[in-house]
């Protein structure tokens, strides 16, 4: 008999004794025979199994309170849980006889395909070359095609920064041109030689004519030419230019020399455009881009200039210089068009129209007899409201400005003399805007687009497969895009796909302009014969733009028929 110790509780058991009792209970429960499954399952569960409903595994009888045989205890079933509410997993094994058949693929396995079918508005400037989006190889569904099938692409006036062509046939013919082929391509470009390739080339690698034409289609003209600086794009290029050598940034004399040479080149380009010896050219500044087009292109009988994006300050400066312009994407409202038609309306006329609109807006208050109770906004408030509306569209596609006819010459002088054309601080300080042209001009330097054939991985049903691809990088202008597609149509037997990466501020150049009369295309082509473009390219650029504020982003050619998305 244990001695009575003060403060000792008789019900207290030492740890070894507790462990011994637990082992004894586990052995006694394991010895008891578990009842059959049919008896332990509730009637509702048996009915659900017969109906083929997915059920959770029913816990064993000995699972409550601990596992049998000293093993881990089974999870207790929630008595309030529904029998059919568990999430369905793709790799889950079948639970009942009704699920023995193999199931269809789980819907979320195709989510990547669905996302790819919705072409994104914006693409990264550069992606990994070894991974091509699957969308460039899928066929277009009917609602996604913006127009009927066509043998030609719509005209696209945006500048592309990168093209990625893919095909089932190799592009090895585009690599390692011979010295004679490279020289012949340069001569063909300088002499504007018209080359017509056959519909299909059996062996592109042995076709010297194809390789020379490919070299010809990669040439463009640039000013200024500074090989250590990326001169396109200029908008948002400060980070790429940071740390680069720029001796003119703090040298006013050198800046003056650069701007003088740039003014001569700019004037030379405009004179070529006016005489229809140059079809178009671009002026790329650090804030906006200007597209000058010759008369006859884009359905216009006059020289046109599009500026995008613009700000209220730039538009006010153009008004002060007497430049008549309009905002094509701003619709008419009330008595006047909400455009900045510089000198079409004088200040007095605009003020009179504004006062008339204000009187009409408050006329209904007088009819109700409450005009004295409503505080009429003063002229200053109305002016501030209008200025806020103008500022809100700054740097947006809606701020694109259109200049026509003789006003383009006034715009030329305005840009040459404008102090805000060149950055005064930052990596681009003192650097003149970039001039891009498809033909030679005074002070221009011949440049080449970079081309290389690579292999890309595309997702297939059995994993990944190799696809032949051709990558083009650089400032790809509209004539180069059309020339390359014509060339690849012959070399790839009328079948390829392409992903296009546009310079976003230039996508708005595809807007349709309101024309005064319909042009005779035969006369237009005859007048622009010496502009240096292939007749087929000239015919395409003469068409009225149809893409609006968007640009081509994906193109698929199958059996010489184009489908595209913008």
From Swiss-Prot:
UniProt-reported outcome of changing residue 446 to T: In MISSLA; reduced protein level; reduced nuclear localization
One GO term (biological process): DNA replication
Induction: Expression is cell-cycle dependent with highest levels during S phase.
Chain positions with Phosphoserine modification: 28, 34
Subcellular location per the Swiss-Prot or TrEMBL entry: Nucleus
Tissues expressing the protein: Expressed in the brain, with higher levels in prenatal compared to adult brain.
Keyword Nucleus: yes
Nucleus listed as a keyword: yes
Residues covered by region (Disordered): 1-110
Oligomeric form and interacting partners: Component of the replisome complex composed of at least DONSON, MCM2, MCM7, PCNA and TICRR; interaction at least with PCNA occurs during DNA replication.
Protein family membership: Belongs to the DONSON family.
Task of the protein: Replisome component that maintains genome stability by protecting stalled or damaged replication forks. After the induction of replication stress, required for the stabilization of stalled replication forks, the efficient activation of the intra-S-phase and G/2M cell-cycle checkpoints and the maintenance of genome stability.
Name of this chain's protein: Protein downstream neighbor of Son
UniProt organism field: Homo sapiens (Human)
Lineage of source species: Eukaryota, Metazoa, Chordata, Craniata, Vertebrata
Designated gene of the protein: DONSON
């Amino acid at each position: 008999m244990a001695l009575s110790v003060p403060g000792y509780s008789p019900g207290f058991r030492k740890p070894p004794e507790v462990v011994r009792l637990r082992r004894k209970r586990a052995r006694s429960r394991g010895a008891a025979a578990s009842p059959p499954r049919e008896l332990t399952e509730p009637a509702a569960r048996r009915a659900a199994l017969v109906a083929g409903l997915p059920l959770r595994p029913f816990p064993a009888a000995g699972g409550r309170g601990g596992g049998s045989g000293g093993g881990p205890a089974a999870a207790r079933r929630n008595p309030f849980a529904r029998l059919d509410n568990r999430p369905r997993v793709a790799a889950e094994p079948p639970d009942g006889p009704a699920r023995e058949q193999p199931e269809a693929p789980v819907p979320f396995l195709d989510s990547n395909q669905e996302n790819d079918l919705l072409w994104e508005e914006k693409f990264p400037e550069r992606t990994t070359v070894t991974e091509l989006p699957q969308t460039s190889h899928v066929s277009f569904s009917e609602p996604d095609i913006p127009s009927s099938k066509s043998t030609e692409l719509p005209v696209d006036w945006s500048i592309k920064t990168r093209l990625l062509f893919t095909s089932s046939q190799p592009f090895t013919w585009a690599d390692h041109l011979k010295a004679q082929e490279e020289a012949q391509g340069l001569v063909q470009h300088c002499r504007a030689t018209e080359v017509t390739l056959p519909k299909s080339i059996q062996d592109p690698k042995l076709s010297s004519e194809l390789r020379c034409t490919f070299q010809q289609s990669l040439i463009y003209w640039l000013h200024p030419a500074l090989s250590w600086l990326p001169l396109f794009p200029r908008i948002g290029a400060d980070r790429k230019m940071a740390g680069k050598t720029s001796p003119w940034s703090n040298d006013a004399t050198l800046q003056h020399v650069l701007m003088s040479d740039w003014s001569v080149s700019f004037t030379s380009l405009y004179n070529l455009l006016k005489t229809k010896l140059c079809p178009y050219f671009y002026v790329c500044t650090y804030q906006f881009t200007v597209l000058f087009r010759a008369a006859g292109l884009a359905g216009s009988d006059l020289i046109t200039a599009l500026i995008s994006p613009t700000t209220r300050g730039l538009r006010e400066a153009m008004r002060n210089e007497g430049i008549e312009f309009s905002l094509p994407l701003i619709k008419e409202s009330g008595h006047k068009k909400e455009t900045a038609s510089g000198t079409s309306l004088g200040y007095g006329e605009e003020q009179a129209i504004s006062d008339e609109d204000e009187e009409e807006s408050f006329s209904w208050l007088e009819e109700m007899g409450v005009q004295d109770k409503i505080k009429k906004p003063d002229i200053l408030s109305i002016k501030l409201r209008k200025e806020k509306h103008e500022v809100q569209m700054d740097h947006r596609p809606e701020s694109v400005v259109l200049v026509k006819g003789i006003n383009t010459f006034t715009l030329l002088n305005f840009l040459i003399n404008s102090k805000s054309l060149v950055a005064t601080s930052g990596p681009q300080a003192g650097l003149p805007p970039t001039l891009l042209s498809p033909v030679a001009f005074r002070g221009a330097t011949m440049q080449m687009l970079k081309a290389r054939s690579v292999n890309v991985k595309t997702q297939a049903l059995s994993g990944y497969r190799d696809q032949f691809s051709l990558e083009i990088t650089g400032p790809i202008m509209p004539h180069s895009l059309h020339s390359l597609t014509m060339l690849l149509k012959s070399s790839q037997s009328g079948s390829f796909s392409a992903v296009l990466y546009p310079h976003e501020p230039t996508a708005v150049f595809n807007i349709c302009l309101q024309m005064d009369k319909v042009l005779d295309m035969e006369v237009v082509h005859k007048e622009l014969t010496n502009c240096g473009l292939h007749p087929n390219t000239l015919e395409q650029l003469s068409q009225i733009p149809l893409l609006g504020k968007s640009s081509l982003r994906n193109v698929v050619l199958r059996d010489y028929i184009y489908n595209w998305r913008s």
